[in-house]
Amino acid sequence: MKIFFAVLVILVLFSMLIWTAYGTPYPVNCKTDRDCVMCGLGISCKNGYCQGCTR
């Protein structure tokens, strides 16, 4: 069970790394720049979407 949990944690961490490095596969809606914090620092909200987060 510990091995399964360790593998699961590693998969989650790698998926989060890929998410932040390459953006999301779908547009992230926002109203202000503060809504784009999950995409990284300095990402701006333009036309209702986080620009640097969306592919």
Swiss-Prot record:
GO terms for cellular component: extracellular region. Its main location: secreted. Expressed by the venom gland. The keyword Zinc-finger does not apply. SUPFAM superfamilies: Scorpion toxin-like. It comes from the Eukaryota. Residues 1-23 form the signal peptide. Keywords: Disulfide bond, Secreted, Signal. It is found in: Secreted. Disulfide bonds join 30-45, 36-50, 39-53. Negative results: does not show any effect on Na(+), Ca(2+) currents, nor on voltage-gated and calcium-activated potassium channels. This is Neurotoxin BmP08.
